[in-house]
């Protein structure tokens, strides 16, 4: 078991949360149900150290630090959140993505690594997208769709103790919401999504677990403002998870061009 520490230099084993499994001809996301055709997701840990961070992520003020995110906020957020999948690699990849502009969405880089045309589930249909920015160190990717999908979510910052919620999809493509709390802002350093040395990312340490398929999902505060993007759990089920701070999203947005990025490697 890995024990989580918040002191500088504490080493954590993180588990990426996109669901992966053997590809099938149906193109459906892998199921986590215990059936003869179910697949087991790959959970390659990365060695990561964390240090407290006070770097601001936005000028949007944080929400109240008490209570839970209201159901009305969760419902409004849900309209901008979609499941995403791809079958280009040896394993199916399933995660969550959300709108930051009518035709731009954010997800985790490990969800779409090696995927040329990520497929979004939007309502009862499907929408193709292309990867227009990709950073294996911050574990973020930005997708563009040919059509506008709706109203984007605002982004801002959170402080320790803020009540937040994850709005995402599970590995079966079913909607989920989880109430969490921001423990502290950290600097997570270590390997990138490919296991190579990286400079790290500004992240949030969260009290509460997340699950397979949740990667790329937005962490929202009581006003519906996105304060982080979920990317990992601690190995061992200790009730701690991690989200990339939105300041990293703003950095990646500056790299978005009119054309898709060159093909990325599968993990």
Regions found by a protein language model. Name each.
Residues 85-87, 121, 167-169, 220, ...:
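A generic structural motif
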Residues 1-6:
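Positively charged n-region of N-terminal signal peptides that target proteins for export
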Residues 77-84, 141-151, 176-266:
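Active-site region of chymotrypsin-like
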Residues 10-19:
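Bacterial N-terminal signal peptides
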Residues 21-26:
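Bacterial signal peptide processing site
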Residues 67-71, 80-102, 108, 126-128, ...:
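A conserved glycine-rich beta-strand in the N-terminal activation segment of trypsin-fold
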Residues 90-94, 101-176, 260-264:
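Conserved active-site neighborhood of the chymotrypsin/trypsin-like protease fold
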Residues 31-64:
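Extracellular mucin-like PTS domains
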């Amino acid at each position: 078991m890995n024990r989580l520490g918040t002191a500088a230099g504490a080493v954590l084993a993180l588990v990426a949360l996109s669901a992966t499994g053997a590809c099938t001809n149906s193109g459906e996301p892998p199921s986590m149900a215990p059936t003869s055709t179910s697949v087991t997701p790959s959970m390659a840990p990365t060695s990561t150290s964390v240090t407290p961070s006070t770097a601001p992520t936005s000028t949007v003020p944080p929400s109240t630090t008490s209570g839970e995110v209201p159901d009305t906020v969760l419902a409004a957020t849900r309209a901008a959140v979609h499941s995403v999948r791809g079958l280009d690699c040896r394993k199916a990849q399933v995660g969550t993505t959300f709108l930051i502009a009518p035709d731009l969405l954010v997800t985790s880089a490990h969800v779409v690594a090696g995927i040329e045309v990520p497929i979004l589930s939007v309502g009862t249909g499907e929408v193709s997208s292309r990867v227009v920015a990709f950073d294996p160190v911050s574990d973020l990717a930005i997708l563009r769709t040919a059509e506008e999908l709706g109203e984007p979510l605002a982004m801002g910052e959170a402080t320790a103790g803020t009540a937040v919620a994850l709005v995402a999809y599970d590995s079966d493509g079913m909607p989920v919401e989880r109430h969490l709390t921001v423990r502290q802002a950290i600097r997570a350093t270590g390997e990138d999504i490919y296991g190579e040395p990286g400079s790290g990312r500004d992240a949030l340490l969260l009290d509460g677990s997340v699950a397979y398929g949740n990667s790329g999902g937005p962490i929202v505060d009581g006003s519906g403002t996105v304060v982080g993007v979920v990317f990992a759990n601690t190995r061992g089920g200790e009730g701690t998870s991690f989200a990339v701070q939105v300041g990293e999203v703003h950095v990646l947005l500056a790299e978005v061009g009119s054309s898709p990025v060159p093909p990325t490697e599968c993990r």
